[in-house]
């Protein structure tokens, strides 16, 4: 019984990136978090399925949803776009079976990726907030309006640790 949370009713969430996880969370009456930061194509359908299948439980009376969102915030829109190129390159590498360390950002993504790789990476980053403070704030507000989520979880894989910290400060 050396569990730190024993007897504290620590909230249990179901985190998923599929329709099955959404349906299961709803049926079990659990809060649901969707991994839209890497699996955006099912986000809206998963949230609708979760809410439609929600059964109240002793832990939760109504649906409570969260979505994970990529954020690349910087002082300017151009710098936010540049910071996001690390993830674009990373997704391109994953799609070709060549994962590795997160690459540094580049000024011209078209110089390092093919048009098909750029499109594939952009589709994986559909739900991202990228740019300067005002742009990112609007994109976050638009995302919340679109999804009606109760909470956001933010991630932002950036090559430069200081840029990542600054991005979080901006948000």
Protein language model features and the residues they cover:
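Generic C-terminus detector
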Residues: 144-170
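Residue-level signal for short, function-critical loop segments
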Residues: 18, 38, 71, 158
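An alpha-helical appendage that flanks or caps ligand/catalytic pockets
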Residues: 1, 41-148
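Catalytic domains of carbohydrate-active enzymes, especially glycoside hydrolases
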Residues: 28-31, 146
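Internal, glycine-rich beta/alpha segment that forms the wall or movable "lid"
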Residues: 1-28, 41-45
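Flexible loop/turn segments at secondary-structure boundaries
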Residues: 21-22, 41-42, 74-76, 160-163
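Hydrophobic faces of well-ordered beta-strands that scaffold small-molecule active sites
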Residues: 11-15, 32-35, 63-70, 150-154
